[in-house]
Design a protein with these regions (language model features):
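Arg/Lys-rich, alpha-helical DNA-contact motif
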Residues: 2-8, 22-34, 38-73
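Short coil turns linking two alpha-helices in DNA-binding domains
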Residues: 13-16
Length: 73
């Protein structure tokens, strides 16, 4: 799915999902022909749910990255 489709499916703002992507929290695959980022639907929906729950619990983005096993770049 595209990031726009994830926005519609989750209700999370585009800018927030883009930030999660840039931070490495939301993995994607990039289509070579048009450079569109594609996200795996189920994996992405689950990851967004996890991130939202951790944010609601007061966790910072660096803490979430550590908890989810995302390496710092």
């Amino acid at each position: 799915v595209t990031i726009g489709e994830l926005v519609r499916l989750t209700g999370v703002r585009y800018s927030t999902l883009k930030f999660y992507t840039e931070e490495g929290l939301l993995p994607f695959e990039q289509a070579e022909e048009n450079l569109t980022r594609r996200y795996r639907r189920q994996e992405s929906l689950q990851r967004i749910q996890e991130i939202r729950a951790l944010r609601a619990a007061g966790r910072s983005v660096p803490e979430i990255k550590s908890l989810l096993g995302v390496s710092a770049e």
